[in-house]
UniProtKB/Swiss-Prot annotation:
GO terms for cellular component: cytoplasm. Keywords: Cytoplasm, Elongation factor, Protein biosynthesis. Associates with the EF-Tu.GDP complex and induces the exchange of GDP to GTP. It remains bound to the aminoacyl-tRNA.EF-Tu.GTP complex up to the GTP hydrolysis stage on the ribosome. Disulfide bonds: none annotated. It comes from Streptococcus uberis (strain ATCC BAA-854 / 0140J). Residues 80-83 are annotated as: Involved in Mg(2+) ion dislocation from EF-Tu. GO terms for molecular function: translation elongation factor activity. InterPro entries: EF-Ts_dimer_sf, Transl_elong_EFTs/EF1B, Transl_elong_EFTs/EF1B_dimer, Transl_elong_Ts_CS, UBA-like_sf. It is found in: Cytoplasm. Belongs to the EF-Ts family. Pfam families: EF_TS. Its main location: cytoplasm. This is Elongation factor Ts.
Length: 346
């Protein structure tokens, strides 16, 4: 039987990423054959990964990477926040973003077949990471953005990498693009423009807003405050030419009833129309980047600010770790109970 030296164990660990005991056991089982030991660890790693496949991984990090005129933002998940801070995990996330930006896959299936800097496929890298780290590690999603030579990327990560953003702007510079990405990280828009919102979604969100107004009015009534008006519309998409024309006529009728001289109406109407637009595009303001008040200049929307500096938002992608993942509150408790039960039965 071959002698299993510390040097041999170290070499196997460096090649496989396995722990000391796992590496030593693999060498013992394969009589010191390095290639067979690596293959054995790979098979055991796949088995470990398979056992962890149905676990919920809702922690993790985002990664962003710019490669020429392409940029990628990715989300990689782990089961615990502790592992998400692990150096091996962070390297995996960064390598994944780089691989996506340079490989330009069309979907997750293509992405999983790309070759990582380590020389293995992305899919294999995650199997091995799950085996060596000891938690389910999963590649969840990516977004790949492209720009022209004249456009600019804004790459930004917030909260230790839990939020990752890439934006594309035309005009301006990289610094402005990064500021736009910082706004996106903070304000959570889901689309660029109101034209991308689903009509039924707008109706549903408008109903929620009016329900909140109804609840607020109940509280206001208790302290003899005047009720707030309900919203008629929620998006610019609902404001047809007829709707806007009627709003202007209503304002004129209001001014006439107040006895305001017609000669000053032209000075009053634009401000009231701006207010009408603001009050009736609340859904746009919540979900569309261009309609949101710009955090760097709260006197303007993002669209108005960019227009004032001869720039334009083209596209963006924003990922926040765990969004949309339903994590059971008793995952940890269940795992501990199962471990104790197994120990008692052995």
């Amino acid at each position: 039987m071959a002698e299993i030296t510390a040097k041999l164990v170290k070499e196997l660990r460096e090649k496989s990423g396995a722990g000391v005991m796992d590496a030593k056991k693999a060498l013992v089982e394969t009589d010191g054959d390095m290639d067979k030991a690596i293959e054995l660890l790979r098979e055991k790693g796949m088995a470990k990964a398979a056992k962890k496949a149905d676990r919920v991984a809702a922690e993790g990090l985002t990664g962003v990477y710019v490669s020429g005129n392409y940029a990628a933002v990715v989300e990689v998940n782990a089961e615990t926040d502790f592992v998400a801070k692990n150096a091996q995990f962070v390297e995996l996330v960064n390598d994944t973003a780089k691989t996506i930006a340079e490989g330009k896959p069309a979907n997750n299936e293509e992405a999983l077949n790309l070759i990582m800097p380590s020389g293995e496929t992305l899919a294999a890298a995650y199997v091995n990471a799950t085996a060596t780290i000891g938690e389910k590690i999963s590649f969840r999603r990516f977004s790949l953005l492209e720009k022209t030579d004249e456009q600019h990327f804004g790459a930004y990560q917030h909260n230790g990498g839990r939020i990752g953003v890439i934006s594309v702007i035309e005009g301006g510079d990289d610094a402005l693009a990064k500021q736009v990405s910082m706004h996106i990280a903070a304000m959570k828009p889901t689309v660029l423009s109101y034209t991308e919102l689903d009509p039924q979604f707008v109706k549903d969100e408008l109903a929620k807003l009016n329900h909140n107004i109804e609840l607020d009015n109940e509280s206001r009534a208790m302290v003899d405050k005047a009720p707030l008006p309900f919203l008629q519309y929620g998006s610019k998409a609902q404001l047809s030419e007829d709707v806007i024309a009627k709003a202007e006529e209503d304002i004129k009728a209001e001014l006439a009833a107040e006895g305001k001289p017609e000669k000053i109406w032209d000075k009053i109407i634009p401000g009231k129309m701006d207010r009408f637009m603001l009050d009736n595009t609340k859904v746009d303001q919540a979900y569309t980047l261009l309609a949101q008040v710009y955090i760097m200049d709260d006197s303007k929307t993002v669209e108005a600010y960019l227009d004032s500096v001869n720039a334009k938002a083209i596209a963006f992608a924003r990922f926040e770790v765990g969004e949309g993942i339903e994590k059971k509150a008793n995952d940890f408790e269940s795992e501990v109970a199962a471990t104790m039960a197994a120990a008692l039965n052995n």
